[in-house]
Amino acid sequence: EDHVKKVKIVRKLEKKHNRFICILGDLQGPKFRVGKFTNVKEQLKKNQEFTFDQNKKDGDSKRVYLPHKEIFKSISVGQRLLVNDGKVRLKVKSKSPTSIKCLVTDGGEISNNKGLNIPDTKLDLKIITPKDKKDLQLAIKLDVDWIALSFIQTTKDLLTAKKLIPSKFKVMVKVEKPSAMDEIESITENCDGIMVARGDLGVETNPEDVPIHQRTMVAACRKFGRPCIVATQMLESMIDSPTPTRAEASDVATAVFQGVDAVMLSAESAAGNYPKEAVEMMDKIIKRVESDSKYLANIQNYNLDHTKTSTEAIATAALEVASIASCNCIATFSQ
């Protein structure tokens, strides 16, 4: 009911302000969580052993139930398991069909139903879960514009999921798994848009790798003419502050200079104390970058390593003419 109400509000505002607003239906995808603990939470210490198993009994400081058989099947010795957004890190020492014995490499708190990430493992799982199918039907009923797919690992995952989505809906791939980067060009070519989902991607990769992955995804989107969204922690401090940090302003500006099509707010507008100010600040940064003389030159100078079609050639020429003549808009024929 909440989603239905919000969609109606957006469509009403579209008419009021005469602006087209895209609505994206975000499918959660496969989400892994640990079981429960007798004492609700436990403190794991570095270098201790800890086991994930198929025993449904409440956990303690030495073990916990993991209700995902596909992990036991796919994970290998030496691979990592990350709990609580990567705050607790473990490495697999040994495994059996019903048990994964680990060494804690970074200790911390683990508690009931905390999320689990497996960055080094390609899992054999259903990308569209039963919950996703139910949510997809609601998205179709609400006539959203885009469907976002979470935790896509391979092109095969994408193509399998697309079979369940009516062709009238655009498909956005949220790149959250490092394994997706191995096939990023193929994934980009076979979807309608890419979201650089830096939250889960940042948990499963090293912090220094995330900016490189972002540039790679933006380049792939430019190569295949796909929209690209950069998301997560863009103005994170504005959840509690009316102004961003200088680093956050620079982060947003860098994404715009790279040529992305959209920058996205998450908790800043969904749960923050300054949602209006966060949107206004994001808008100011975008407009400031786009008014910079080097911005257009930067965009035009990107190397597109594919053969330009006649349509692309005409569009490129139209862009240059519009820039030189300071045109407010470009009119095109749809057929």
Name each region found by the language model.
Residues E1-Q335:
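Non-catalytic helical/linker scaffolds that mediate oligomerization, partner binding
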